[in-house]
Amino acid sequence: MLFFIYSVFINTFEMYLQNKKSFNYLLLFMKQTFALLAGLFCMALPTLADDDKPTINVDFMTRVGYLNDRVDNQIRHDVSGFKGEYLLFSISGQLNDRISYAWRQRINQKKEVNDRFDGTDWVYVDYKANDHWNLAAGKQVAMVGGYEYDRCPIDIYLSSEFWNNISPFQFGASATYTTTNGKSRFTGQVTQSLFNTPANRDMFAYHLHWAGSYGWFNSLYSVNMVEYEPSRFISYIALGNKFNVGNASLELDFMNRAASHQTFLLKDCSVMARFDYKLMPQLGLYGKFTYDVNRTDTEADKCVHSGTEMTAYGGGVEVYPIKNRNDVRVSLGMSHSQGTNSNPSGALNDNQTTVRLSFLAKLHLLSWKSK
């Protein structure tokens, strides 16, 4: 069924690409739609905020630590030592029982002159039409499947080459349908391309996403079409699976990537797996494995370059010093990568070993509700 949906998805957009005039009309229509949605939300906020009790939640997240990073057993002084890696501040809440909002800002993110929103992960408004349908607009997470992709960045110690080069936070709009039992959510979303540039801000990406929650098994699946150059697309099939048994969990992701006329499966793909086991309430173990490969001869994949084949693995311990609280922890881990990375600016290197000691905190600073 997933591959049938994917085929329909691809064929539809190839029809648009064959008719440049129609495609331009589509782009113009989406721009006007985004502007209309934003205007309607802005007009609605002052009126609806008075109809119910608004809430505000303020949260703070950070990760600092010490790294020892070596390639061919030679220490890399520019990336080793004490580091402040993440500093995030978020505000979320509701204006009433139908309209909610969320904003997350990276305080330590370098901002480009041509994009003042670079440090903003997301800022959007969500409208709950009924128990099944939600509409959202603003800067959002582009809905690509997979549990590595879905994790908060401060929770990732070892990541795939794909994860290191993707830009998941983009302006767009989405519609989500939740089933009656609440176990599945289906989302359709249109965003800026994950590869948009200052010279091409009007490139787009199209996403269909399924999030399932079935107790021992959870899923984050998607099919995606991402414009990597004007009128040229790369497609993703992302299959994220999570299995929970007692104190153990396994996240297993597979992603296949293909541009037009490429061999469909396994030429350009990634596999990510993470295993977690809670030995006791205040001590946990984790292990991680990633594999990225691109055996195509095109430049369509901007995340895993043609000619790349990289394997990485590692593991460590997590200590929770505050009893019955997982929002503060200390982590010690080690990872190793090997293979060929054809991206000169890539994150993973051949024969690279990293030892990481990290302190993480997710602090809930404020929760307020109007009386």
Give the positions of each predicted feature.
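Membrane-spanning beta-strand positions in outer-membrane beta-barrel proteins
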Residues: 55-57, 100, 134, 183-185, ...
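Outer membrane beta-barrel
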Residues: 51-66, 78-193, 212-213
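Short, well-structured alpha-helical patches and their helix-loop capping segments
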Residues: 160-167, 198-202, 290
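Exposed loop/turn and edge beta-strand positions of beta-sandwich/beta-sheet ligand-binding modules
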Residues: 85, 119, 131, 169, ...
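Outer-membrane beta-barrel pore domains
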Residues: 61-77, 113, 124, 128, ...
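Short strand-coil-strand connectors
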Residues: 178-182, 213-215, 244-246, 322-324
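Loop-centered beta-sheet repeat module
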Residues: 187-233
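Cleavable N-terminal export/targeting peptides
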Residues: 1-52, 364-371
